[in-house]
């Protein structure tokens, strides 16, 4: 897997792009990423994970990161992605307008963009799936729930870890968490 900085101007002749913070690369994230790999193979193009580091919740709300950037990239490679684009999330990136993000994605020539149901982007989370669909074909991966019916999320996994429920957090992640 090739790793690129978001500001390097990567261009591809065609791709399927999965977008997200992917903190923890939990089972919900894995569903999004696997869908990107599967669709890219079906369409004969490269698969791309576009991620931000650190995750916004960690940067601005002080939440614990579940995975380092390297751990995240290692998981992407295991899942079979061809490329990872890493945007370094800071105040400047957070202030980006939605059109700047759309322009950046356009260079990847996405045949499809794959996101989770709650995907938002741009300054103040102004961009949504409807806006993304005006520019690209978008596929939304349904929320992944655990056996008790609750949504799998990085926030929920953090809460389990804080309570010392390591076994349950590992189940939701789908792989062992580094300490």
From Swiss-Prot:
InterPro entries: FAD_synthase, Riboflavin_kinase, Rossmann-like_a/b/a_fold
Pathway note: Cofactor biosynthesis; FAD biosynthesis; FAD from FMN: step 1/1; Cofactor biosynthesis; FMN biosynthesis; FMN from riboflavin (ATP route): step 1/1
Secretion signal span: none
Pfam entry (one): FAD_syn
GO molecular function: ATP binding; FMN adenylyltransferase activity; riboflavin kinase activity
Reaction catalysis annotation: riboflavin + ATP = FMN + ADP + H(+); FMN + ATP + H(+) = FAD + diphosphate
Keywords: ATP-binding, FAD, Flavoprotein, FMN, Kinase, Multifunctional enzyme, Nucleotide-binding, Nucleotidyltransferase, Transferase
Classification via Gene3D superfamilies: HUPs (3.40.50.620)
EC top class named in words: transferase
Domain of life: Bacteria
GO term, biological process aspect, one: FAD biosynthetic process
Enzyme Commission (EC) number: 2.7.1.26, 2.7.7.2
Physiological role: Catalyzes the phosphorylation of riboflavin to FMN followed by the adenylation of FMN to FAD.
Similarity comment text for this entry: Belongs to the RibF family.
Name of protein: Putative bifunctional riboflavin kinase/FMN adenylyltransferase
Source lineage: Bacteria, Bacillati, Bacillota, Bacilli, Bacillales
């Amino acid at each position: 897997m090739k790793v690129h900085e978001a500001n390097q101007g990567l261009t591809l002749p065609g791709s399927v792009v999965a977008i997200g913070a992917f903190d923890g690369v939990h089972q919900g994230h894995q569903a999004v990423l696997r869908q990107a790999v599967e669709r890219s193979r079906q369409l004969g193009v490269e698969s791309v994970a576009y991620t931000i580091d650190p995750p916004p919740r960690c940067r601005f709300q002080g939440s614990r990161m579940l995975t380092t950037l390297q751990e995240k990239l290692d998981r992407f490679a295991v899942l079979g992605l061809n490329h990872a684009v890493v945007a370094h999330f800071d105040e400047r990136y957070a202030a980006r307008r939605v059109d700047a993000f759309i322009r950046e994605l356009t260079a990847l020539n996405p045949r499809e963009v794959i996101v989770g149901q709650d995907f938002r982007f741009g300054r103040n989370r102004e961009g949504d799936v409807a806006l993304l669909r005006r520019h690209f074909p978008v596929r939304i991966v349904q929320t992944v729930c655990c056996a008790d019916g609750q949504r799998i999320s990085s926030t929920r996994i953090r809460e389990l870890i804080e309570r010392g429920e390591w076994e349950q957090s590992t189940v939701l992640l789908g792989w062992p968490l580094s300490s």
